[in-house]
Amino acid sequence: METSKLFLLSSSLLLVLLATRPCPSLSERCNPKDKKVLLQIKKALDNPYILASWNPNTDCCGWYCVECDLTTHRINSLTIFSGQLSGQIPDAVGDLPFLETLIFRKLSNLTGQIPPAIAKLKHLKMVRLSWTNLSGPVPAFFSELKNLTYLDLSFNNLSGPIPGSLSLLPNLGALHLDRNHLTGPIPDSFGKFAGSTPGLHLSHNQLSGKIPYSFRGFDPNVMDLSRNKLEGDLSIFFNANKSTQIVDFSRNLFQFDLSRVEFPKSLTSLDLSHNKIAGSLPEMMTSLDLQFLNVSYNRLCGKIPVGGKLQSFDYDSYFHNRCLCGAPLQSCK
């Protein structure tokens, strides 16, 4: 009897020990090479609080700001967002070879240039380096990352010209370079992207020159060139057969006759305000299902066409033109 009790007690203790002891195959999924790189990144950023969970004694697949592939257990996502973090993007980021998502966002103390080491990450699909104090040029090496579908470098201090080689990205769906200090013309190659046509966000820069003639065939879903120093004839961009929905060309120096422009039938938002556009509003605008319209602060004349959504917009959408009249403005004489 005593022997049986002793056996049961020993068995129970053994089960407790096995249950509380971590099993290496279950507790440590993270690839050791990836863990080493992540710890290097943490050290380079001076061990910020946002990365406090990056403990070398725990599985890095469970760390905050990272994700692992469910099959390979390699790090495929690094997202550092809105924390007290300072310094530069560490070169070690380029040593996470299976990374598909790279995000450093809303980090006002992140400085320096975008490191060339990122060019090694051939699996990248999404890059968001935005709302930081990154400076320097927009790197041309992004054109080597052929799997990119989303590139967001907005709200930074980037300067210099836009690399035309970005048009070589065959899968790009959206390009955000807005709210920087970029200069020079829009590359002619942007009218001929290698694959799908990305939504183009270039607003709040210091871009100058004319719209490339290649934009005659450019058909993005969204096109925002507002608040630059662009000039010339913008009418080449518009075509009734395009599928563009949102257009903002406001606060530039565009100068052309609006009278015969044929807007895309798909257009839902149009902002041409604060330019030097002359002529009259085309009658075909009454057929558009516009949700937003602003043509104020131009040199337009004539009667606002009656019909469609044109009378649903406020006075502010039309005022400060040369001699535009009709509802919602004053009656034509």
UniProtKB/Swiss-Prot annotation:
Membrane topology summary: Peripheral membrane protein
Chain segments annotated as transmembrane: none
Source taxon at top rank: Eukaryota
PROSITE patterns from the UniProt entry: LRR
One record GO biological process: defense response
Subcellular location: Secreted, Cell wall; Membrane
Signal peptide: 1-27
Residues with attached carbohydrate: N109, N133, N147, N157, N241, N294
Pfam families: LRR_1, LRR_8, LRRNT_2
LRR repeat windows: 72-96, 97-120, 121-144, 145-169, 170-192, 194-220, 221-240, 241-263, 264-288, 290-312
Matching InterPro entries: Leu-rich_rpt, LRR_dom_sf, LRR_N_plant-typ, PGIP
Major location (coarse): secreted
Coiled-coil residues: none
Keywords per UniProt: Cell wall, Disulfide bond, Glycoprotein, Leucine-rich repeat, Membrane, Plant defense, Repeat, Secreted, Signal
Gene Ontology terms: cellular component: extracellular region; membrane
Keyword Protein biosynthesis: no
Cystine crosslinks: C30-C60, C61-C68, C301-C323, C325-C332
The family this protein is said to belong to: Belongs to the polygalacturonase-inhibiting protein family.
Protein's job: Inhibitor of fungal polygalacturonase. It is an important factor for plant resistance to phytopathogenic fungi.
Record's protein name: Polygalacturonase inhibitor
Organism per entry: Vitis vinifera
